[in-house]
A protein has these predicted regions:
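Cytosolic, long alpha-helical scaffolding segments
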Residues: 1-158
Length: 158
């Protein structure tokens, strides 16, 4: 884990911590949205799929919160070097997580349609694929929050 000295202005550290917390909440919500959308697909549960579709708005709101917070930090704190890279990374991560949430919503939408049709060939690989996606999201966010380049590079080897 990379260690960084605290900033002279404590509120700057608090702002960065708040941004990390928003990204972490987004990641957790993405993980659950993916798992639940695949569960709805596999169990052919249209009601569960509808809940997932409605929950996508929470991810959209968190992305907007992350963007607003990042812009505020940049405007008020004028971060440099590592701090600026972390904030820009958080902005990009928020966008990617929101897109992942959209994919989960899309799975849920399709599962509602599939629930009304006849079962088709084996789909046993879908839950395993979802498990791997959730694992990679979790490990990526851990590397980001811990500011650990070794963990981040290890993800490239997967």
């Amino acid at each position: 884990m990379a260690e960084f000295a605290a900033h002279t202005v404590k509120s700057f550290d608090e702002d960065i911590a708040q941004l990390r917390a928003v990204i972490t909440r987004m990641g957790g919500l993405c993980e659950s949205q993916i798992a639940e959308s695949v569960d709805a697909l596999m169990s052919r549960n249209a009601e569960a799929a509808q809940i997932i579709i409605e929950n996508d708005k929470r991810l959209d709101a968190l992305e907007a919160e992350a963007e607003a917070l990042a812009v505020r930090i940049i405007a008020l704190r004028a971060p440099l070097a590592d701090d600026l890279r972390e904030i820009v990374s958080a902005l990009k991560i928020a966008g990617v997580l929101e897109r992942i949430g959209d994919y989960a919503k899309n799975i849920a939408k399709r599962s509602a349609v599939i629930a009304q049709s006849q079962p088709v060939g084996p789909a046993v690989i879908i839950p395993e694929m979802a498990r791997l996606v959730v694992e990679i999201i979790r490990d990526t966010l851990d590397a980001f929050v811990d500011r650990d380049p070794v963990k981040a590079l290890a993800l490239l080897q997967r």
